[in-house]
UniProtKB/Swiss-Prot annotation:
The lineage of its organism: Bacteria, Pseudomonadati, Pseudomonadota, Alphaproteobacteria, Rhodospirillales. It comes from the Bacteria. Belongs to the class-I aminoacyl-tRNA synthetase family. Glutamate--tRNA ligase type 1 subfamily. This is Glutamate--tRNA ligase 1. Coiled coil: none annotated.
């Protein structure tokens, strides 16, 4: 494959959610699977809603995921170049002025539907004479400009969907320039893809309908189009669409909840394929063997609970040295005792006091005699990983307690909770003095 250059083109009108983060991840993986690179293109022409803060948040979120780009571009800063493309298309006779109001266009569409016809623009603007255009402008009307599609078959090999085609005669000539002179998304996107030498455009299948139009615009500007791949859109677990308004699935909120970026990358890379997500793989490892044709045609559903589960797998596999590198200031033995019980790192706030702080023991009245006997039988130090089994065997013999009736009261007395890390590993870390005090019902 020739040199691969992809682009991720978010609009800085909100935080990244998992849907557009997936586009970024898949573009990066595809590029790096083929020795290529990614361009970050901010589609920042929506001045009313776009902010510099959102743009920076997008950069921060991408870097948090580990995604890199070789260059960053702003569409707004390229307005002069886009205007040149408008002039080029006008000069070639591919842009023509139209003067209908939105109400007039809607009326025509209703009539077409009532007649059983597709609501396709009838090219009335193309038939206007210079005198008719002048008369309309004298009324105060300003033109919007449509791209004249060739009424022919446009075909492309979609790298995710296979062979695709659309006939220009079945499509409305798209508006590229509004009445106020501002450009719709379509033309700047094509111009930027040409100028940046983008080789592959990987995006959601909601853009499939635009592809034939963009290919024709690209060729009208004297360039060959990039390769395209359109993937099914991700749905929520309930079957709804993802949105910037769904804050629970924004990268910023997921980060605040303690979700690991590697968990997000793994899930987004596997979503829609037959592969199980592996959060222990790096981005480079995920890129190895990455294939667009591995994705199915059905819209995958994304359950945030999967991210929690995958994040937990990362913590469970984290070595003491890796934990220290993350700034987790606990001993090796304590980390090994606690990690299997972590869902997010914030769980440490509840677990650490069991060893390093004070807890209030929970001792039910019906367990008091058994706990007193356990305190009497508590072994002398030194303690090791076998102390728990030796001690509980002695308590079992002395009290007749076994199973849950033996272990649950001891856990409540020693930790103040009903569940947690294995006490065989935890008991030596708690220490004899603190354990004895808790068995006596003292806060320690």
């Amino acid at each position: 494959m020739s040199s691969v250059l992809v682009r991720f083109a978010p609009s800085p009108t909100g935080r990244l959610h998992l849907g557009n983060a997936r586009v970024a991840v898949l573009n990066w993986l595809f590029a790096h699977a083929h020795g290529g690179a990614m361009v970050l293109r901010l589609d920042d022409t929506d001045i009313a809603r776009g902010t510099a803060e959102f743009a920076q948040a997008i950069r921060d979120d991408l870097l948090w995921l580990g995604l890199t780009w070789t260059r960053e571009e702003s569409q707004l800063a390229r307005a002069a170049r886009h205007a040149e493309a408008v002039d080029q298309l006008k000069a070639a006779g591919r842009l023509y002025a139209c003067y209908e109001t939105p109400e007039e266009l809607e009326y025509r569409r209703r009539r077409q539907r009532a007649q059983g016809l597709p609501p396709i623009y009838d090219r009335a603007g193309l038939a206007l004479s210079a005198a008719e255009r002048a008369a309309l402008e004298a009324e105060g009307r300003k033109p919007h400009w449509r791209f004249r599609l060739d009424h022919e078959e446009t075909s492309w090999l979609d790298l995710a969907r296979g062979p695709c085609h659309a006939h220009g005669g079945h499509l409305s000539d798209p508006v590229l320039v509004r009445e106020d002179g501002s450009l719709l998304y379509t033309l700047p996107s094509v111009v930027d893809d040409i100028d940046f030498a983008i080789s592959h455009v990987i995006r959601g299948e909601d853009h499939v309908v635009n592809t034939a139009v963009q290919i024709q615009i690209c060729r009208a500007l004297g360039a060959e189009p990039p390769h395209y791949a359109h993937l099914p859109l991700v749905l929520t677990a309930e079957g709804g669409g993802l949105s910037k308004r769904d804050n629970a699935l924004s990268l910023g909120d997921l980060r605040a909840q303690g979700i690991e970026p590697a968990a997000i990358n793994a899930l987004l890379a596997a979503l829609g394929t037959a592969e199980a997500p592996d959060p222990l793989k790096s981005l480079d490892e995920l890129a190895q063997g990455f294939r667009l044709d591995a994705f199915g045609r059905a819209a995958p559903r994304l359950d945030p609970a999967d991210l929690v589960r995958l994040s937990a797998r990362i913590y469970h596999a984290l070595s003491p040295s890796e934990a220290r590198a993350r700034g987790i200031a606990v001993s090796d033995a304590l980390w090994l005792a606690l990690r299997a019980n972590l869902t997010t790192l914030s769980d440490l706030d509840e677990l650490l006091p069991v060893v390093e702080g004070e807890i209030t023991p929970l001792i039910a009245e019906e367990d008091r005699a058994m706990i007193d006997e356990a305190a009497r039988l508590l072994p002398e130090t030194p303690w090791d990983a076998t102390t728990w089994a030796t001690w509980t065997a002695a308590v079992k013999t002395a009290t007749g307690r076994k199973g849950k009736g033996l272990f649950m009261p001891l856990r409540r007395a020693l930790t103040g909770v009903d569940h947690g890390p294995e006490l065989a590993a935890l008991l030596p870390l708690i220490g004899r003095d603190k354990a004895l005090a808790r068995l006596r019902g003292e806060k320690a």
